[in-house]
């Protein structure tokens, strides 16, 4: 079905029209249900009950008539139902949508002139109209649906469905995988989080050489995605799979997606395992990887997910293992908890092939055991009882993750909210021994900071549990750096459960001028979180200062191609300001210059990449004179501001941007530093070993390898196999090569130069199409932003626009006088033949074949400069022509009229108003008209009422 303005899903539309257009012919065999599915239906969430259909979520056993929008409206002769599958438990699990045509179920009527009442599928006799809602209509057909296109379905009236919540509030789905291999003792554990359309993974491993790649495959081994594994410390690999295809998401939710680690010694995968959903992941705060103790054994390993009870010192855990069963159906196991070889706890369990794992509780941990737990000194040993000795063991540590612990401190979140314009920014690292490293920046307080505490949420007023008293400010009074070593197991558990707060008290506000919630920020794929501090954003830094109760911080970095990566977090904004937040990158306040809007705000968070940053802003960034300005509806000139300094040596346009120093510190005025002051953490973009003679610069995972050379993402070059007449581009690890297409020369006798692909006119021979002319004077050439290249004055070319490649239906010209690039669409000539063809597949315009007829016909509608016409159901209709759409095999839809306007088809249902005042009518195409004969059984209800009153 063609695209229409209103219907949301063309395939759904066509399928339902095929069902609803059958002629009414009394009863008959029930039509088989067609597999109707919406193209844009939300993906079902694992474990959610109900069905998703047409962009809405329906409960189990709910029935509805699909609404196709205008002009088709609700298909009342089609009934859909959400059915529970037979294998699912009652009220649980995703349902199955079944739709069928219920027109054949309409009863046969005795009257000669049945009527069609609005909101009904079946016709009724006039004398039964008053009790039509009691007649034996097919189930589900008595509902009256409004025609208002903004009406809400039944599933929208209450709480939104699970699938809608998943995409509306940034809900994260977590999965875990145990990775082992038959020829190795290595064991790895992968934790994967699906957030919107990105898959963020943290993989920890033991007894494994540094992995080279992370690989995701389907059940048959087909590679779906690969990510370079940057060298990291502590056996941790981080990465992001962006824009995950829907099929891969379905495989993940069906637990059919497999993750593997590739090493130089095992290029075909050393360890692998399927990703499974585990509810215990949301509560996990401690973990363990269990490896073999016998150096001669292979292919066995396990992982443990542990958490503390919220009400007592009990350790709950889930243990997953592979290779212990040895092909047996049931195996008894023994679990021991050791400290320096001394047995502390022991329990027994049974494992089966169907459930290779078990859950247990270690109750009533002593204070000493709690201390050993947070210090990472408790060892977990799992042993197979009976048969050959088989033991795996590992130490319990705090959960490892690529996420970043951080906090934005603002006055709005203080125990007694204040509005001073001050702001705070904090970053944390939790070490394996339970120690917490903190770095806190404070900006804009009106008085001296007297206390900085890490504490729990107060249960009552003035009843706060302080876990750590932090050191005072240093480095000019704007920063505090230190270590909290006394959190304990309970404190570490609460920290990883996002249950702690950072409070800053000043002389003017001893109970707290700034306060922030310590939370884990999802890994975003770049190393800025680990090697530099965030930029604090405060109202006090706005000129003039703003006494805002909000605050924020931002991570910004430049990669080797001068692409700006940013991530902004805000706190303390009112609900009315949430949808009005914008962020701009600009130069010094009060100075004219370019500004760049940073897009991507999702609530109070924003992240993205700017790939074409202006050179002026790049210089401001490297010189430390750039500003990040946050504006809101109440403060359109600036709610928050931060000063940005990024030490970078990236290259843009053949020029190297180098700052004075690579390692900077926080300035006394609160400017954000870019030095790697945080302890070495898992760097997601760390470089792979560089080749001899290289600069050792980090390798972008999007680079391309072609003809023995590495090419960065976005690079353009002439390939060795055809250096004159081909052009290649690198687009995210994919090389696209296009032949150079020469436009027709504007002179009768062009000249072919030896060093050029296209012939040029003699007077313009000196104007060469060079890939880069950085030293051109004004008026000598043009810079084309599409492929980022300089062109000589007077040059004409077909543009190359990444990632689309060569655009042959456009010609660009460099106007030397002004330095402007003028691009226009290729004007295809009108053709008189009936079947034009393209002589070459790469041609833009069609031609008449040799020997073709001369039947008059419009030129290619896509290239014509006149009215374009409309394509509808595979046919072209001229501008302003109207028609009734045809739906095979049922023929013309006489009740719907379509018209072509401005190249877009518009369809609407014919209006049959005003209603007939005569009693009998005759169907004429769509609407009825009065006839001469009338009978009592065909008179309208108002006429019958008037006749009764007269009598």
Swiss-Prot record:
<dbReference type="GO" id="GO:0009986">
    <property type="term" value="C:cell surface"/>
</dbReference>
<dbReference type="GO" id="GO:0045785">
    <property type="term" value="P:positive regulation of cell adhesion"/>
</dbReference>
<feature type="region of interest" description="Disordered">
    <location>
        <begin position="669"/>
        <end position="701"/>
    </location>
</feature>
<dbReference type="GO" id="GO:0005576">
    <property type="term" value="C:extracellular region"/>
</dbReference>
<feature type="glycosylation site" description="N-linked (GlcNAc...) asparagine">
    <location>
        <position position="350"/>
    </location>
</feature>
<dbReference type="GO" id="GO:0007417">
    <property type="term" value="P:central nervous system development"/>
</dbReference>
<dbReference type="GO" id="GO:0008542">
    <property type="term" value="P:visual learning"/>
</dbReference>
<dbReference type="GO" id="GO:0017038">
    <property type="term" value="P:protein import"/>
</dbReference>
<dbReference type="GO" id="GO:1904888">
    <property type="term" value="P:cranial skeletal system development"/>
</dbReference>
<keyword id="KW-0677">Repeat</keyword>
<dbReference type="GO" id="GO:0045545">
    <property type="term" value="F:syndecan binding"/>
</dbReference>
<dbReference type="GO" id="GO:0045185">
    <property type="term" value="P:maintenance of protein location"/>
</dbReference>
<dbReference type="Pfam" id="PF07452">
    <property type="entry name" value="CHRD"/>
</dbReference>
<dbReference type="GO" id="GO:0035050">
    <property type="term" value="P:embryonic heart tube development"/>
</dbReference>
<dbReference type="GO" id="GO:0045668">
    <property type="term" value="P:negative regulation of osteoblast differentiation"/>
</dbReference>
<dbReference type="GO" id="GO:1990926">
    <property type="term" value="P:short-term synaptic potentiation"/>
</dbReference>
<feature type="domain" description="VWFC 4">
    <location>
        <begin position="870"/>
        <end position="930"/>
    </location>
</feature>
<dbReference type="GO" id="GO:0021513">
    <property type="term" value="P:spinal cord dorsal/ventral patterning"/>
</dbReference>
<dbReference type="GO" id="GO:0050808">
    <property type="term" value="P:synapse organization"/>
</dbReference>
<comment type="subunit">
    <text>Interacts with TWSG1 and/or BMP4.</text>
</comment>
<dbReference type="GO" id="GO:0001501">
    <property type="term" value="P:skeletal system development"/>
</dbReference>
<dbReference type="GO" id="GO:0048844">
    <property type="term" value="P:artery morphogenesis"/>
</dbReference>
<dbReference type="GO" id="GO:0030336">
    <property type="term" value="P:negative regulation of cell migration"/>
</dbReference>
<comment type="similarity">
    <text>Belongs to the chordin family.</text>
</comment>
<dbReference type="GO" id="GO:0001707">
    <property type="term" value="P:mesoderm formation"/>
</dbReference>
<dbReference type="GO" id="GO:0014030">
    <property type="term" value="P:mesenchymal cell fate commitment"/>
</dbReference>
<dbReference type="InterPro" id="IPR016353">
    <property type="entry name" value="Chordin"/>
</dbReference>
<feature type="signal peptide">
    <location>
        <begin position="1"/>
        <end position="26"/>
    </location>
</feature>
<dbReference type="GO" id="GO:0014029">
    <property type="term" value="P:neural crest formation"/>
</dbReference>
<dbReference type="InterPro" id="IPR001007">
    <property type="entry name" value="VWF_dom"/>
</dbReference>
<feature type="domain" description="VWFC 2">
    <location>
        <begin position="702"/>
        <end position="762"/>
    </location>
</feature>
<feature type="domain" description="CHRD 1">
    <location>
        <begin position="171"/>
        <end position="280"/>
    </location>
</feature>
<feature type="domain" description="CHRD 4">
    <location>
        <begin position="529"/>
        <end position="649"/>
    </location>
</feature>
<feature type="domain" description="CHRD 3">
    <location>
        <begin position="402"/>
        <end position="523"/>
    </location>
</feature>
<dbReference type="GO" id="GO:0001701">
    <property type="term" value="P:in utero embryonic development"/>
</dbReference>
<comment type="function">
    <text>Dorsalizing factor. Key developmental protein that dorsalizes early vertebrate embryonic tissues by binding to ventralizing TGF-beta family bone morphogenetic proteins (BMPs) and sequestering them in latent complexes.</text>
</comment>
<feature type="compositionally biased region" description="Basic and acidic residues">
    <location>
        <begin position="936"/>
        <end position="951"/>
    </location>
</feature>
<dbReference type="GO" id="GO:0035906">
    <property type="term" value="P:descending aorta development"/>
</dbReference>
<dbReference type="GO" id="GO:0048663">
    <property type="term" value="P:neuron fate commitment"/>
</dbReference>
<feature type="glycosylation site" description="N-linked (GlcNAc...) asparagine">
    <location>
        <position position="880"/>
    </location>
</feature>
<dbReference type="GO" id="GO:0048845">
    <property type="term" value="P:venous blood vessel morphogenesis"/>
</dbReference>
<dbReference type="GO" id="GO:0043395">
    <property type="term" value="F:heparan sulfate proteoglycan binding"/>
</dbReference>
């Amino acid at each position: 079905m063609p695209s229409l303005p209103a219907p949301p899903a063309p395939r759904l539309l066509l399928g339902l029209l095929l069902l609803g257009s059958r002629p009414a012919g009394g009863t008959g065999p029930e039509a088989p249900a067609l597999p109707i599915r919406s193209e844009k239906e939300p993906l079902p969430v694992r474990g959610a009950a109900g069905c998703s259909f047409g962009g809405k979520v329906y409960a189990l056993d709910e029935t509805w008539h699909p609404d196709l929008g205008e002009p088709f409206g609700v298909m009342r002769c089609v009934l859909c139902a959400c059915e529970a599958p037979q294998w699912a438990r009652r009220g649980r699990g995703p349902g199955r949508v079944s739709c069928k045509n219920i027109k054949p179920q309409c009863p046969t009527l005795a009257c000669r002139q049945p009527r069609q009442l609005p909101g009904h599928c079946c016709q009724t006799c006039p004398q039964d109209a008053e009790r039509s809602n009691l007649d034996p209509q097919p189930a589900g057909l008595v509902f009256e649906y409004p025609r208002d296109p903004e009406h809400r379905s039944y599933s929208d009236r209450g709480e939104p469905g699970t699938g809608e919540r998943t995409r509306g509030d940034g809900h994260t789905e977590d999965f875990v995988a145990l990775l082992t291999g038959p020829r190795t003792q290595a064991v790895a554990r992968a934790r994967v989080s699906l957030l919107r359309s990105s898959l963020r993974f943290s993989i920890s491993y033991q007894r494994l050489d540094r992995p080279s790649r992370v690989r995701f495959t389907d059940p048959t081994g087909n590679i779906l995605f690969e990510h370079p594994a940057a060298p990291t410390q502590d056996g941790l690999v981080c990465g992001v799979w962006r824009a995950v295809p829907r099929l891969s998401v379905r495989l993940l939710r069906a637990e059919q997606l497999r993750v593997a680690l590739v090493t130089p010694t095992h290029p075909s995968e050393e360890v692998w395992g399927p990703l499974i959903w585990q509810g215990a992941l949301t509560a996990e705060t401690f973990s363990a990887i269990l490896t073999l103790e016998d150096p001669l054994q292979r292919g066995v390993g396990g992982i443990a997910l542990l958490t503390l009870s919220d009400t007592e010192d009990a350790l709950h855990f889930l243990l997953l293992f592979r290779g212990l069963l040895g092909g047996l159906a049931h195996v008894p196991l023994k679990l021991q908890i050791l400290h320096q070889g001394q047995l502390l706890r022991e329990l027994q369990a049974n494992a089966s092939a169907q459930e290779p794992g078990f859950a247990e509780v270690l109750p009533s941990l002593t204070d000493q055991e709690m201390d050993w737990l947070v210090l990472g000194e408790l060892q977990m040993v799992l042993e197979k009882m009976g048969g050959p000795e088989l033991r795996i063991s590992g130490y319990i540590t705090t959960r490892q993750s690529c996420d970043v612990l951080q906090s934005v401190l603002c006055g709005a979140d203080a125990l007694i909210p204040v509005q001073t314009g001050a702001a705070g920014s904090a970053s944390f690292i939790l070490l394996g021994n339970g120690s917490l490293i903190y770095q806190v920046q404070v900006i804009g307080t009106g008085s001296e900071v007297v206390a900085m505490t890490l504490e729990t949420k107060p249960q009552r007023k003035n009843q706060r549990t302080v876990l750590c008293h932090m050191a005072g400010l240093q480095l000019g009074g704007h920063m505090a750096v230190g270590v909290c070593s006394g959190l304990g197991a309970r404190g570490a558990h609460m920290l990883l459960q996002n249950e702690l707060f950072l409070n800053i008290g000043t002389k003017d506000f001893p109970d707290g001028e700034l306060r922030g919630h310590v939370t884990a920020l999802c890994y975003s794929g770049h190393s800025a979180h680990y090697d530099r501090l965030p930029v604090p954003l405060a109202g006090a830094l706005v000129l003039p200062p703003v006494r805002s109760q909000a605050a924020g911080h931002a991570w910004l970095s430049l990669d080797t191609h001068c692409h700006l990566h940013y991530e902004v977090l805000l706190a303390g904004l009112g609900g009315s300001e949430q949808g009005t937040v914008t962020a701009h990158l600009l130069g010094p306040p009060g100075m004219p210059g370019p500004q760049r809007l940073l897009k991507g705000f999702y609530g109070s968070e924003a992240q993205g990449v700017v790939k074409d940053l202006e050179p002026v802003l790049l210089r401001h960034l490297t010189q430390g004179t750039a500003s990040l300005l946050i504006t809101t509806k109440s403060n359109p000139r600036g709610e928050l501001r931060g000063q940005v300094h990024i030490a970078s040596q990236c290259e843009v346009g053949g020029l190297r941007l180098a700052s004075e120093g690579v390692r900077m510190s926080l300035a006394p005025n609160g400017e954000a530093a870019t030095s790697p002051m945080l302890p070495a953490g898992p760097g997601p973009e760390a470089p792979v070993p560089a080749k001899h003679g290289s600069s050792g610069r980090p390798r972008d995972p999007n680079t391309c390898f072609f003809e023995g050379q590495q090419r960065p993402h976005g690079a353009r070059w002439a390939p060795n196999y055809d250096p004159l007449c081909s052009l290649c581009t690198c687009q995210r690890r994919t090389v696209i090569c296009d032949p150079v297409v020469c436009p027709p020369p504007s002179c009768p006798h062009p000249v072919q130069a030896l060093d050029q692909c296209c012939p040029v006119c003699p007077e313009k021979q000196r104007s060469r199409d060079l890939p880069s002319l950085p030293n051109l004077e004004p008026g000598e050439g043009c810079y084309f932003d599409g492929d980022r290249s300089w062109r000589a004055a007077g040059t004409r070319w077909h543009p190359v626009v990444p990632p689309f490649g060569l655009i042959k239906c456009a010609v660009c010209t460099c106007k030397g006088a002004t330095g402007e690039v003028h691009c226009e669409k290729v004007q295809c000539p009108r053709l008189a033949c009936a079947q034009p063809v393209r002589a070459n597949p790469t041609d833009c315009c069609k031609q008449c074949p040799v020997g073709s007829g001369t039947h008059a016909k419009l030129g290619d509608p896509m290239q014509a400069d006149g009215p374009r016409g409309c394509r509808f159901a595979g046919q072209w209709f001229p501008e302003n022509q109207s028609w009734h759409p045809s739906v095979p095999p049922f023929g013309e839809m006489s009740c719907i009229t379509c018209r072509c306007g401005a190249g877009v088809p518009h369809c609407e249902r014919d209006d049959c108003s005003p209603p007939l005042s005569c009693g009998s009518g005759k169907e004429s195409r769509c609407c009825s008209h009065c006839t001469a004969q009338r009978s009592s059984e065909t008179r309208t209800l108002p006429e019958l009422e008037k006749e009764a009153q007269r009598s």
